[in-house]
UniProtKB/Swiss-Prot annotation:
It is found in: Secreted. Glycans are attached at residues 218, 285, 368, 378. InterPro entries: GDSL, GDSL_esterase/lipase, SGNH_hydro_sf, SGNH_plant_lipase-like. Transmembrane segments: none annotated. Residues 1-35 form the signal peptide. It comes from the Eukaryota. PANTHER family: GDSL-LIKE LIPASE/ACYLHYDROLASE-RELATED, GDSL-LIKE LIPASE_ACYLHYDROLASE. This is GDSL esterase/lipase At5g08460.
Length: 385
């Protein structure tokens, strides 16, 4: 990374650290992450591995291998990633879990679909996330192939078989118990299901409250399946403020400076249930004695950034850096489209996804933030348990 880029991000991060709730992270660590974490394989990782289950916010290439419209394996996606080439990540650069992995001292973990033919290191973790995937099986079906939460858990079982071949049974048990699980799902169940009444019946069958209950029930089932496989350290990311993304601003013709509150309220209904789930699992006689579940308040952190953008170095909060139409969110980033010039000043990269600059802030808050960012503890604290 060039010195000018480092100082630009340093100014942004120091401002956010002094003004907002982000706990100050040592500057050498921020430089290390921004530089790509090249030495992560030579450091002692805070977790032996990280396993990621999620959607396009954390997909690092799985959908490249699927017959899906939800793919980002073309420029300008990846324009700020190493090599300036697309990887299947839905951003101009790194995702939140890319940054989290570097903060934890882990090497870049592979997409599940890149591991199926063997020859890839899976012992530091695997990413199962799939763009358009949701908690519900039918979510995102209009976009083609994708891995739902249930399917991602099934894919993990294949990885576990491979891991079990290389370790003794007791070693596998210890490895699983110490590894980190990151789950980021639920966004598509709204934007690619409930909020598309012409394609899905869910909004005519369920009111927002009962739909949130349905999501939580299915989510809990799959989460406990992962617990049953032996995982003991979980971070569960909440749904973001979907009423503020360019796609919804354009679709609902939101007034300048406003979000679609009805959509945000739906997201909060689900998030409130996730917090209650975390509390319940952390107090349950069985799970609480063996495991810890953490809620990542991505909603609150995102609202903070959108409300106080200048404190974080952002200037544009209501339109994508790459996209077409109102709010640059009616049509998402197309192949070889020309993105905005100052990408680090934009919260949103395209109609649905944030920029690398936004992802870095969220990752830092998850890593070393207060209880308002990660509840009941942050990732740094979780690693010491």
């Amino acid at each position: 990374m060039h010195d000018s880029e480092i100082f630009k991000f340093k100014d942004m991060m120091m401002m956010s650290c002094t003004v907002q709730t982000l706990v100050l992270v040592p500057w050498f660590l921020v430089v290390f992450v921004l530089a790509g974490g090249e030495d992560s394989s030579e450091t002692t990782a805070m977790f032996p591995a990280m396993f990621v289950f999620g959607d396009s916010l954390v997909d690092n290439g799985n959908n490249n291998h699927l017959n899906s419209l939800a793919r980002s394996n073309y420029l300008p996606y990846g324009i700020d990633f190493a090599g300036n080439q697309p990887t299947g990540r839905f951003s101009n650069g790194k995702t939140i879990v890319d940054f989290i992995g570097e903060l934890l001292g882990l090497p870049e973990i592979p997409a599940f679909m890149d591991t199926v033919d063997g020859g890839v290191d899976i012992l530091h973790g695997v990413n199962y996330a799939s763009a358009a995937g949701g908690i519900l099986e039918e979510t995102g079906r209009h976009l083609g192939e994708r891995f739902s939460m249930g399917r991602q858990v099934e894919n993990f079982e294949k990885t576990l078989m491979e891991i079990s071949r290389s370790m003794r049974k007791e070693s596998v048990k210890e490895y699983m118990a110490k590894s980190l699980v990151v789950v980021s799902l639920g966004n598509n169940d709204y934007i690619n299901n409930y909020l598309k009444p012409r394609l899905f019946l869910s909004s005519s069958i369920y009111d927002p409250t009962s739909f949130a209950d349905l999501l939580l029930s299915n989510f809990t089932t799959h989460l406990l399946e992962l617990y049953g496989k032996g995982f003991r350290k979980f971070v569960i990311a909440g749904v973001g403020p979907l009423g503020c993304i360019p796609d919804q601003l354009a679709a609902q013709a939101a007034l300048p400076g406003e979000c679609v509150e009805a959509v945000n309220e739906m997201a909060e209904l689900f998030n409130n249930r996730l917090v209650s789930l975390v509390d319940r699992l952390n107090s349950d006689n069985k799970t609480a004695s063996e495991a810890i579940f953490v809620y990542g308040n991505t909603y609150g952190a995102a609202v903070d950034i959108l409300t106080n953008p200048f404190n974080y170095g952002f200037e544009v909060t209501d339109r994508g850096c790459c996209g077409v139409g109102r709010n640059r969110g009616e049509i998402t980033c197309l192949p070889l489209a020309v993105p905005c010039a100052f990408r680090d000043r934009h919260v949103f990269w395209d109609a649905f996804h944030p920029t690398q600059a936004f992802n870095l802030i969220i990752a830092l808050r998850a890593f070393n933030g207060s209880k308002s960012d990660c509840y009941p503890i942050n990732l740094s604290q979780l690693s010491r348990l």
